[in-house]
Amino acid sequence: VNNVDGVTREALESKQREPLLHRIYGIADCWMISGVLAVSCITVSLNSNYIIVRDKERKISMDFVSSPILPRTISFSYLVFNCIVTFIINVLVFILSQIYLAAYGAYRISFLDFLAIIGIVLLSSLSASTLTYFICSFIQREAIRSPIVAIVSAGVGFLIGAYRPSNRGPKYIGEVTMFFPGTYSAGLFRNYFMSRPISLLTNLFSQAEYEVFKPLVGVLSNEFSLTLSFFGQVVSPLTRRGVIFAFVGIFLVLDIIFSSRNALNFLQSRKKKKKKEESSSKEGK
């Protein structure tokens, strides 16, 4: 944003283009908001898993396993709870961000883009829920979960490239980020948040009155890259959705497998404990 300011501020202020300046700042704001939403889907989901760890710590999960309820049903219940909480909170964040952008005349989203972003929030919430539930299924104590949440919350924005354009920094870092589902969510958010503002600004600069600012479009496009590249291959928005669905499917299967395995291990250990107690009582007699 500072580079953009250096190129445009003097010309904008000299021609009293305050509404235009707001639109340019709005593009930077859209970039940051899309990153915040991508990060928030992960951090909110990770924090929502406190109830899973709490149930394990208080031995409530053992009561569930001992009941006639199937282990996959228990896992599915936790996942649905996590996804609903994550989705609702991020929808509220999205609505507040749109109120902020509209309040100072930066950008008003179209109805179709609004529905598309709501869909991306739902897909990202589902992806984050399956991933974070898988991680937290191995955590038995809240004292372990809390520092993990703190570390992930601090670094996940850079890990998925939410706060850094893909064309900035070492190339290998950009390639590593492509192995995380949050990277594709951030890319989808950027496309729907920023494509229309940049398009409107391009059309505006094509007018003779604003022709002096036409080079700014190239600067903005370079500063806020909307493309994702996986080892030199450009990843289209449709492919990004497919990758997120693939991650959801993989971690959903892993969640079911490991929840069933954990339940089986618990029941076996309980039977062994019961047999040991019975043998001890017989010896006592």
Regions inferred by a protein language model and the residue ranges of each:
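Hydrophobic alpha-helical transmembrane segments
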Residues: V1-A28, S260-F266, K282-K285
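Long, hydrophobic alpha-helical segments
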Residues: A28-I51
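Residue-level recognition of transmembrane alpha-helices
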Residues: V36, D55, Y78-L79, I117-V121, ...
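Transmembrane helix boundary and interhelical loop/hinge segments in multi-pass membrane proteins
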Residues: S45-I69
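Short hydrophobic alpha-helical segments within the ABC transporter permease transmembrane module
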Residues: I60-S61, I74-I84
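Short amphipathic alpha-helical coupling elements at transmembrane boundaries
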Residues: M62-S66, Q140, M178, N191
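Alpha-helical transmembrane segments and their short interhelical loops
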Residues: P71, F81-Y163, R241, G249-I256
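Alpha-helical transmembrane segments of multi-pass membrane transporters/translocases
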Residues: N191-R270
